[in-house]
Regions:
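Left-handed beta-helix
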Residues: 6-199
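Conserved nucleotide-sugar donor-binding
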Residues: 1-3
């Protein structure tokens, strides 16, 4: 396209559209019956997920089946509803496991094939596919994606580099060993809230 320069940052909405109008080139719009939600940055993504869970985005429904008021699940979610504390709006992806004693406070989204271990707390957080949140871990206002933990403002850290990958890891890993004596000592020091993941 000859109006987009190569080799430099160029935004369609901020650069191209104004350039077309400025040069009196054809530029058309069409009314559409949907709501545009921009997710260019982490805070935007965070806001979009919250808005969907709270029913604020027109023509977008929470996927899955509503199993309790404000709590939606995909297929084959393993949970004993009498032994967990879940306050919606919450979405739990298919094939996920929520262990007894876990707490999930919405708006929160847990992707497919996740494991939220006993005593873990997920509060206003987004957990991506195949994440395992260890016993007693408390996540508030966090986004967990692979080996990264991201705050809602975009600040992040690498769980492996921070040596916290024994608390939050890939649910598909089979090589998990018993926590080291140092890790057990840290858990005892921190008490029932095993760890608050830092901002």
């Amino acid at each position: 396209f000859n109006h987009i320069p190569s080799g430099e940052k160029f935004d369609i909405g901020a650069d191209l559209f104004p350039k077309l109008v400025e040069n009196n080139l054809p530029f058309y719009a069409l009314p559409m019956d949907f709501e545009w939600v921009d997710i260019g940055k982490v805070p935007d993504y965070w806001s979009a997920i919250r808005s969907v869970l709270q029913g604020k985005v027109r023509q977008v429904d929470i996927p899955g089946k509503e199993v309790k008021p404000g709590v939606y699940t995909g297929l084959n979610v393993a949970v004993n509803w009498d032994k967990v504390n879940i306050t919606g709006p919450v979405y739990i992806g298919g094939m996920s496991r929520i262990e007894d004693g876990a707490t999930i406070i919405g708006p929160s989204m847990i992707g497919p094939s996740c494991c939220i271990c006993e005593g873990a707390t997920i509060d206003n957080s987004i957990i991506f596919d195949y994440s395992k949140i260890g016993k007693g871990v408390r996540l508030v206002d966090k986004l967990v994606f692979g080996r990264y933990c991201v705050g809602k403002n975009g600040d992040h850290f690498d769980l492996q580099e921070a040596s916290l990958d024994w608390l939050i890891t890939d649910s598909r890993r089979m090589d998990l060993s018993e926590p080291s004596p140092q890790q057990k000592a840290m858990a005892e020091l921190l008490g029932s809230d095993l760890i608050n993941i830092p901002d």
